[in-house]
């Protein structure tokens, strides 16, 4: 169950609701004033005991240590962003004045996994070449892609015009001089790109945790996303 914390002066316990068609357990709390922290604790406890393990929170929320102690955690946008790796990389190249079909993109991580494979397969029809840098399984993945699909995979240290950092432990500096997209962690770095869902309310369109939850729940499709 996904929880949703809403800042409001209303009272009452958690209620089941639909958020753009996605079932959530919603709880209201007023964080202001002398009793604000107590109200937040009560709301967080209600969400957790109601079955929520992850929670969506208002923009700018800075009380996560409190919710983490109660057993709640944020929605990680990483998987959602990695699923958009190909269009994000293509847009990043175009922002540099480069045609994707004439550019090289680097995929970087600690190990070659299913997400890296899917990113490679999605990118190959769009870009000219790929490089794969992953100490665990990277060379094997590159060899398999060459053998099975005839894909142009360059050595891991070959220069690239854009890099996708797919896993924790990889840093923008690892990509060399080319711009990099950090597609993991609670604060991903999209190198100035903006991923949005224009059909949502203005305050929700660029809320990555919300977009991630909607994508996970089948309520958001690639055609509903916009990269600017």
Describe the predicted segments one by one:
Residues 32-45, 139-161, 170-172:
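A short, well-structured beta->alpha microelement
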Residues 73-91:
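A glycine-rich, Thr/Ser-enriched phosphate-binding loop motif common to dinucleotide/cofactor-binding enzymes
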Residues 7-20, 28-32, 179-228:
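Adenosine-phosphate binding glycine-rich loop
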Residues 149-202:
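Rossmann-like adenosine-cofactor binding region
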Residues 15-18, 64-71, 140-145, 160, ...:
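Short loop/helix-cap segments at secondary-structure boundaries that form the rim of catalytic
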Residues 6-8, 29-32, 57-61, 107-111, ...:
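Structural motif
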Residues 95-159:
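Glycine-rich phosphate/diphosphate-binding loop of Rossmann-like nucleotide-binding domains
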Residues 7-17, 21-65:
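Metallocofactor- and cofactor-centric catalytic cores in central/energy metabolism, strongly enriched
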């Amino acid at each position: 169950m996904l929880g949703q914390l809403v800042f409001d002066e209303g009272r009452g316990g958690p209620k089941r609701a639909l958020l753009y068609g996605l079932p959530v357990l919603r709880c209201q709390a007023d964080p202001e004033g002398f009793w604000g922290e107590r109200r937040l604790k009560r709301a967080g406890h209600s969400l957790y005991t109601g079955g929520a393990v992850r929670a969506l929170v208002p923009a700018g929320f800075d009380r996560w240590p409190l919710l983490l102690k109660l057993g709640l955690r944020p929605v990680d946008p990483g998987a959602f962003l990695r699923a958009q790796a190909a269009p994000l990389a293509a847009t990043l190249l175009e922002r540099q004045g480069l045609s994707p079909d004439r550019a090289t993109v680097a995929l970087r991580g600690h190990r070659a996994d299913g997400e890296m494979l899917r990113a490679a397969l999605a990118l190959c029809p769009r870009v000219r070449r790929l490089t794969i840098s992953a100490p665990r399984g990277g060379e094997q993945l590159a060899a398999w892609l060459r053998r099975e699909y005839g894909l142009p995979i360059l050595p891991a240290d070959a220069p690239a015009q854009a890099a996708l950092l797919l896993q924790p432990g990889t840093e923008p500096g690892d990509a060399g001089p080319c711009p990099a997209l950090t597609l993991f962690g609670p604060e991903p770095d999209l190198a100035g790109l903006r991923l949005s869902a224009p059909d949502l309310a203005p305050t929700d369109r660029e809320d990555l945790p919300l977009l991630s939850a909607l994508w996970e729940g089948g309520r958001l499709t690639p055609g509903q996303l916009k990269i600017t």
